[in-house]
Amino acid sequence: MDIIFYHPTFDTQWWIEALRKAIPQARVRAWKSGDNDSADYALVWHPPVEMLAGRDLKAVFALGAGVDSILSKLQAHPEMLKPSVPLFRLEDTGMGEQMQEYAVSQVLHWFRRFDDYRIQQNSSHWQPLPEYHREDFTIGILGAGVLGSKVAQSLQTWRFPLRCWSRTRKSWPGVQSFAGREELSAFLSQCRVLINLLPNTPETVGIINQQLLEKLPDGAYLLNLARGVHVVEDDLLAALDSGKVKGAMLDVFNREPLPPESPLWQHPRVTITPHVAAITRPAEAVEYISRTIAQLEKGERLCGQVDRARGY
Protein backbone atom coordinates (compact mmCIF):
# COMPACT_ATOMS: atom_id res chain seq x y z
CA MET A 1 0.00 0.00 0.00
CA ASP A 2 1.39 3.41 -1.03
CA ILE A 3 0.30 6.71 0.52
CA ILE A 4 1.31 10.16 -0.71
CA PHE A 5 1.11 13.21 1.56
CA TYR A 6 0.98 16.93 0.80
CA HIS A 7 0.30 19.89 3.07
CA PRO A 8 1.91 23.30 2.52
CA THR A 9 2.34 24.12 6.24
CA PHE A 10 2.15 20.93 8.31
CA ASP A 11 5.24 19.19 9.70
CA THR A 12 5.46 16.65 6.89
CA GLN A 13 8.05 14.44 8.56
CA TRP A 14 5.93 14.09 11.71
CA TRP A 15 2.94 13.02 9.64
CA ILE A 16 4.91 10.50 7.62
CA GLU A 17 6.37 8.89 10.72
CA ALA A 18 2.98 8.84 12.49
CA LEU A 19 1.28 7.28 9.48
CA ARG A 20 3.98 4.64 9.12
CA LYS A 21 3.51 3.73 12.76
CA ALA A 22 -0.30 3.63 12.50
CA ILE A 23 -0.30 1.70 9.20
CA PRO A 24 2.82 -0.51 9.31
CA GLN A 25 2.09 -2.14 5.96
CA ALA A 26 2.01 1.24 4.18
CA ARG A 27 4.79 2.96 2.30
CA VAL A 28 4.27 6.65 3.02
CA ARG A 29 6.05 9.43 1.17
CA ALA A 30 5.87 13.20 0.82
CA TRP A 31 4.66 14.14 -2.64
CA LYS A 32 6.82 16.56 -4.63
CA SER A 33 6.36 18.00 -8.08
CA GLY A 34 7.32 15.43 -10.68
CA ASP A 35 6.39 12.43 -8.52
CA ASN A 36 4.22 10.31 -10.80
CA ASP A 37 4.87 6.99 -9.08
CA SER A 38 1.83 4.92 -8.17
CA ALA A 39 -0.16 5.49 -5.00
CA ASP A 40 -3.26 4.03 -3.39
CA TYR A 41 -4.23 6.90 -1.10
CA ALA A 42 -3.55 10.64 -1.06
CA LEU A 43 -3.66 12.86 2.04
CA VAL A 44 -3.85 16.48 0.95
CA TRP A 45 -4.55 20.11 1.71
CA HIS A 46 -4.74 22.60 -1.19
CA PRO A 47 -3.08 20.04 -3.49
CA PRO A 48 -1.58 21.01 -6.85
CA VAL A 49 -3.57 19.67 -9.79
CA GLU A 50 -0.63 17.56 -10.97
CA MET A 51 -0.52 15.66 -7.69
CA LEU A 52 -3.85 13.92 -8.26
CA ALA A 53 -4.45 14.12 -12.01
CA GLY A 54 -4.56 10.76 -13.74
CA ARG A 55 -4.03 8.67 -10.62
CA ASP A 56 -5.97 5.47 -9.92
CA LEU A 57 -6.49 6.16 -6.23
CA LYS A 58 -8.61 4.22 -3.77
CA ALA A 59 -9.44 7.43 -1.86
CA VAL A 60 -8.36 11.00 -1.17
CA PHE A 61 -8.42 12.47 2.34
CA ALA A 62 -8.71 16.24 2.82
CA LEU A 63 -6.75 17.19 5.94
CA GLY A 64 -9.48 19.42 7.34
CA ALA A 65 -13.23 19.72 7.81
CA GLY A 66 -13.76 21.56 4.52
CA VAL A 67 -13.17 20.35 0.99
CA ASP A 68 -13.92 23.56 -0.89
CA SER A 69 -10.28 24.04 -1.93
CA ILE A 70 -10.36 20.68 -3.73
CA LEU A 71 -13.84 21.05 -5.21
CA SER A 72 -13.13 24.54 -6.55
CA LYS A 73 -10.04 23.21 -8.35
CA LEU A 74 -12.09 20.33 -9.71
CA GLN A 75 -14.49 22.77 -11.33
CA ALA A 76 -11.62 24.35 -13.26
CA HIS A 77 -9.69 21.10 -13.74
CA PRO A 78 -12.13 18.15 -13.85
CA GLU A 79 -9.25 15.87 -14.83
CA MET A 80 -7.69 16.43 -11.41
CA LEU A 81 -9.65 13.62 -9.75
CA LYS A 82 -11.58 10.81 -11.36
CA PRO A 83 -15.30 10.77 -10.45
CA SER A 84 -14.94 7.23 -9.13
CA VAL A 85 -12.37 8.19 -6.47
CA PRO A 86 -13.98 8.68 -3.02
CA LEU A 87 -13.16 11.96 -1.29
CA PHE A 88 -13.16 12.07 2.51
CA ARG A 89 -12.91 14.96 4.94
CA LEU A 90 -12.02 14.97 8.63
CA GLU A 91 -15.48 14.89 10.17
CA ASP A 92 -14.35 15.64 13.72
CA THR A 93 -10.90 14.49 14.95
CA GLY A 94 -11.11 16.93 17.86
CA MET A 95 -12.59 19.79 15.85
CA GLY A 96 -16.03 19.30 17.38
CA GLU A 97 -14.67 19.82 20.88
CA GLN A 98 -12.83 22.96 19.79
CA MET A 99 -15.97 24.35 18.15
CA GLN A 100 -17.89 23.66 21.34
CA GLU A 101 -15.36 25.58 23.43
CA TYR A 102 -15.35 28.51 21.03
CA ALA A 103 -19.12 28.75 20.63
CA VAL A 104 -20.05 28.29 24.29
CA SER A 105 -17.47 30.79 25.53
CA GLN A 106 -18.67 33.47 23.11
CA VAL A 107 -22.39 32.87 23.68
CA LEU A 108 -21.85 33.20 27.44
CA HIS A 109 -19.73 36.31 26.84
CA TRP A 110 -22.67 37.97 25.10
CA PHE A 111 -25.31 36.53 27.42
CA ARG A 112 -23.57 38.01 30.46
CA ARG A 113 -23.10 41.31 28.54
CA PHE A 114 -19.32 41.31 28.87
CA ASP A 115 -19.15 43.11 25.51
CA ASP A 116 -21.17 45.99 26.96
CA TYR A 117 -19.09 46.08 30.12
CA ARG A 118 -15.89 46.23 28.06
CA ILE A 119 -17.22 49.32 26.28
CA GLN A 120 -18.13 50.85 29.64
CA GLN A 121 -14.66 50.09 30.94
CA ASN A 122 -13.08 51.89 27.98
CA SER A 123 -14.79 55.08 29.15
CA SER A 124 -14.27 54.40 32.90
CA HIS A 125 -18.03 54.09 33.35
CA TRP A 126 -19.48 52.07 36.27
CA GLN A 127 -23.06 50.99 35.60
CA PRO A 128 -24.72 47.61 36.27
CA LEU A 129 -26.84 46.58 33.28
CA PRO A 130 -30.13 44.64 33.20
CA GLU A 131 -29.51 40.94 32.70
CA TYR A 132 -30.68 39.00 29.69
CA HIS A 133 -33.20 36.23 30.29
CA ARG A 134 -32.24 32.78 29.08
CA GLU A 135 -35.69 31.99 27.69
CA ASP A 136 -35.42 35.04 25.41
CA PHE A 137 -31.87 34.27 24.27
CA THR A 138 -32.51 31.80 21.45
CA ILE A 139 -29.45 30.35 19.73
CA GLY A 140 -29.77 29.49 16.04
CA ILE A 141 -27.30 27.20 14.29
CA LEU A 142 -27.07 27.75 10.55
CA GLY A 143 -25.85 24.44 9.15
CA ALA A 144 -26.69 21.19 10.90
CA GLY A 145 -23.83 18.85 10.14
CA VAL A 146 -21.47 17.00 12.46
CA LEU A 147 -19.96 20.16 13.94
CA GLY A 148 -23.35 21.84 14.24
CA SER A 149 -24.67 18.89 16.23
CA LYS A 150 -21.67 19.07 18.57
CA VAL A 151 -22.21 22.77 19.20
CA ALA A 152 -25.92 22.22 19.85
CA GLN A 153 -25.14 19.49 22.39
CA SER A 154 -22.77 21.74 24.31
CA LEU A 155 -25.23 24.65 24.42
CA GLN A 156 -28.01 22.42 25.74
CA THR A 157 -26.08 22.23 29.02
CA TRP A 158 -26.76 25.95 29.49
CA ARG A 159 -30.51 25.56 28.81
CA PHE A 160 -30.73 28.08 26.00
CA PRO A 161 -33.59 27.68 23.51
CA LEU A 162 -32.00 26.09 20.44
CA ARG A 163 -32.95 25.86 16.80
CA CYS A 164 -31.13 24.76 13.66
CA TRP A 165 -31.52 25.27 9.93
CA SER A 166 -30.26 23.04 7.14
CA ARG A 167 -31.14 21.67 3.73
CA THR A 168 -33.03 18.75 5.29
CA ARG A 169 -34.85 18.52 8.61
CA LYS A 170 -33.00 17.13 11.64
CA SER A 171 -34.26 15.19 14.65
CA TRP A 172 -32.01 16.51 17.40
CA PRO A 173 -33.46 16.18 20.91
CA GLY A 174 -34.29 19.57 22.37
CA VAL A 175 -33.55 21.47 19.14
CA GLN A 176 -36.24 22.98 16.91
CA SER A 177 -35.42 22.13 13.30
CA PHE A 178 -36.09 24.23 10.21
CA ALA A 179 -35.37 23.08 6.66
CA GLY A 180 -35.15 24.62 3.22
CA ARG A 181 -35.26 28.19 1.97
CA GLU A 182 -38.98 28.40 2.65
CA GLU A 183 -38.35 28.06 6.42
CA LEU A 184 -35.26 30.28 6.67
CA SER A 185 -37.16 33.45 7.60
CA ALA A 186 -39.06 31.70 10.39
CA PHE A 187 -35.78 30.26 11.69
CA LEU A 188 -34.07 33.65 11.76
CA SER A 189 -36.95 35.52 13.38
CA GLN A 190 -36.09 34.42 16.94
CA CYS A 191 -32.29 34.05 16.77
CA ARG A 192 -30.62 36.31 19.32
CA VAL A 193 -27.36 34.57 18.40
CA LEU A 194 -26.78 33.21 14.90
CA ILE A 195 -23.95 30.66 14.68
CA ASN A 196 -22.83 29.94 11.13
CA LEU A 197 -21.55 26.43 10.47
CA LEU A 198 -22.64 26.03 6.85
CA PRO A 199 -20.57 24.21 4.25
CA ASN A 200 -19.02 26.26 1.47
CA THR A 201 -21.12 25.61 -1.63
CA PRO A 202 -22.30 27.81 -4.51
CA GLU A 203 -25.70 28.02 -2.81
CA THR A 204 -24.29 29.33 0.49
CA VAL A 205 -21.83 31.95 -0.81
CA GLY A 206 -23.00 35.39 0.36
CA ILE A 207 -25.96 33.94 2.26
CA ILE A 208 -25.37 36.21 5.28
CA ASN A 209 -26.26 39.45 3.54
CA GLN A 210 -28.46 42.47 4.17
CA GLN A 211 -31.66 40.56 3.44
CA LEU A 212 -30.80 37.79 5.90
CA LEU A 213 -29.56 40.11 8.65
CA GLU A 214 -32.75 42.18 8.46
CA LYS A 215 -34.74 39.07 9.41
CA LEU A 216 -32.93 38.70 12.74
CA PRO A 217 -34.31 40.31 15.91
CA ASP A 218 -32.92 43.78 16.62
CA GLY A 219 -29.67 43.56 18.57
CA ALA A 220 -28.79 40.03 17.46
CA TYR A 221 -25.27 38.61 17.46
CA LEU A 222 -23.36 36.78 14.73
CA LEU A 223 -20.76 34.08 15.28
CA ASN A 224 -19.10 32.94 12.04
CA LEU A 225 -17.18 29.68 12.37
CA ALA A 226 -17.59 28.37 8.82
CA ARG A 227 -16.19 30.29 5.84
CA GLY A 228 -15.64 33.96 5.14
CA VAL A 229 -17.41 33.76 1.78
CA HIS A 230 -20.70 33.19 3.57
CA VAL A 231 -20.72 36.78 4.84
CA VAL A 232 -21.10 39.94 2.77
CA GLU A 233 -18.79 41.99 4.95
CA ASP A 234 -20.09 45.42 3.85
CA ASP A 235 -23.64 44.33 4.72
CA LEU A 236 -22.50 43.12 8.14
CA LEU A 237 -20.69 46.40 8.83
CA ALA A 238 -23.82 48.35 7.89
CA ALA A 239 -25.92 46.18 10.22
CA LEU A 240 -23.42 46.71 13.05
CA ASP A 241 -23.37 50.47 12.51
CA SER A 242 -27.17 50.65 12.56
CA GLY A 243 -27.43 48.49 15.69
CA LYS A 244 -29.42 45.80 13.90
CA VAL A 245 -26.55 43.47 14.76
CA LYS A 246 -25.13 44.22 18.19
CA GLY A 247 -21.92 42.23 17.89
CA ALA A 248 -19.99 39.82 15.72
CA MET A 249 -17.31 37.26 16.48
CA LEU A 250 -15.52 36.35 13.27
CA ASP A 251 -12.98 33.57 12.79
CA VAL A 252 -13.03 33.46 8.98
CA PHE A 253 -12.97 36.09 6.25
CA ASN A 254 -13.30 36.63 2.51
CA ARG A 255 -9.57 37.35 2.38
CA GLU A 256 -7.14 35.66 4.75
CA PRO A 257 -5.08 37.00 6.36
CA LEU A 258 -7.57 39.82 6.88
CA PRO A 259 -6.01 42.92 5.24
CA PRO A 260 -4.82 45.61 7.71
CA GLU A 261 -7.05 48.18 6.02
CA SER A 262 -10.25 46.20 6.67
CA PRO A 263 -12.69 48.24 8.81
CA LEU A 264 -13.54 45.06 10.69
CA TRP A 265 -10.27 45.34 12.65
CA GLN A 266 -11.22 48.60 14.34
CA HIS A 267 -14.96 48.14 14.75
CA PRO A 268 -15.84 48.28 18.47
CA ARG A 269 -18.49 45.57 18.11
CA VAL A 270 -16.33 43.05 16.24
CA THR A 271 -13.98 40.46 17.71
CA ILE A 272 -11.52 38.76 15.36
CA THR A 273 -9.58 35.51 15.59
CA PRO A 274 -7.24 34.25 12.82
CA HIS A 275 -9.10 31.11 11.63
CA VAL A 276 -8.35 29.12 14.78
CA ALA A 277 -11.81 28.02 15.94
CA ALA A 278 -11.04 24.39 15.11
CA ILE A 279 -7.68 23.25 13.86
CA THR A 280 -6.64 19.77 12.77
CA ARG A 281 -5.24 17.76 15.68
CA PRO A 282 -2.60 15.56 14.05
CA ALA A 283 -2.75 12.53 16.37
CA GLU A 284 -6.54 12.29 16.17
CA ALA A 285 -6.48 12.83 12.41
CA VAL A 286 -3.94 10.03 11.91
CA GLU A 287 -6.08 7.69 14.01
CA TYR A 288 -9.18 8.53 11.93
CA ILE A 289 -7.37 8.15 8.62
CA SER A 290 -5.73 4.84 9.56
CA ARG A 291 -9.06 3.44 10.78
CA THR A 292 -10.86 4.58 7.64
CA ILE A 293 -8.21 3.10 5.34
CA ALA A 294 -8.51 -0.22 7.18
CA GLN A 295 -12.28 -0.16 6.64
CA LEU A 296 -11.86 0.73 2.96
CA GLU A 297 -9.45 -2.17 2.51
CA LYS A 298 -12.14 -4.46 3.93
CA GLY A 299 -14.78 -3.04 1.59
CA GLU A 300 -16.92 -1.61 4.38
CA ARG A 301 -19.38 1.27 3.93
CA LEU A 302 -18.21 4.46 5.59
CA CYS A 303 -19.43 7.79 6.88
CA GLY A 304 -17.60 10.99 6.05
CA GLN A 305 -17.47 10.60 2.28
CA VAL A 306 -18.03 13.88 0.46
CA ASP A 307 -20.94 14.22 -1.95
CA ARG A 308 -19.22 16.19 -4.70
CA ALA A 309 -22.51 17.45 -6.14
CA ARG A 310 -23.59 18.93 -2.80
CA GLY A 311 -20.11 20.13 -1.86
CA TYR A 312 -19.93 18.47 1.56
Swiss-Prot record:
Organism: Escherichia coli O1:K1 / APEC
Protein name: Glyoxylate/hydroxypyruvate reductase A
Catalytic residues as annotated in Swiss-Prot or TrEMBL: 227, 275
The family this protein is said to belong to: Belongs to the D-isomer specific 2-hydroxyacid dehydrogenase family. GhrA subfamily.
Gene name of the encoded protein: ghrA
Membrane-spanning ranges: none
Protein EC: 1.1.1.79, 1.1.1.81
The keyword NAD is annotated on this UniProt entry: yes
Gene3D superfamilies, A to Z: NAD(P)-binding Rossmann-like Domain
PROSITE patterns in alphabetical order: D_2_HYDROXYACID_DH_3
